[in-house]
Each structure stands twice: as structure tokens, then as C-alpha cells.
Swiss-Prot record:
Species annotation: Lactobacillus johnsonii (strain CNCM I-12250 / La1 / NCC 533)
Protein name listed in UniProt: UPF0337 protein LJ_0034.1
InterPro entries per UniProt: CsbD (IPR008462), YjbJ_sf (IPR036629)
Family: Belongs to the UPF0337 (CsbD) family.
Annotated segments matching region Disordered: 27-53
Compositional bias segments (type: Basic and acidic residues): 44-53
Coiled coil start-end: none
Domain of life according to the entry: Bacteria
Amino acid sequence: MEDKHGIKDKVAGKLKEVEGKITGDKAREVEGKAQQAKGKVKSKATEVKEDLE
């Protein structure tokens, strides 16, 4: 299954962010936020592509 909407990245990123907050690992927290942003970009790109079709 293709993750066209970035859902996997959004969920995995949120989990990493929460894990980082709980453990005090700032790098893990930032990594999670970056992965969430990647998911949002994928989602927006898919939305734009669908609008153009």
C-alpha cells in the first residue's frame, strides 16, 4: 500500500516526538517533528496533484 497521504510519517513522527519528550531526548523529539512535517508535505503534495487531475 502506497502512503500517498503521509499518514505513516505523521503517526511515526508523533510517536518519536512523544518518546523524545518522555525520555528527555531532544534529538529524538526533533526527529519526530521533522518526520511529521515530511508527512504533512506528502499530504499537501497529494492534495495538489489530485486537484490538478
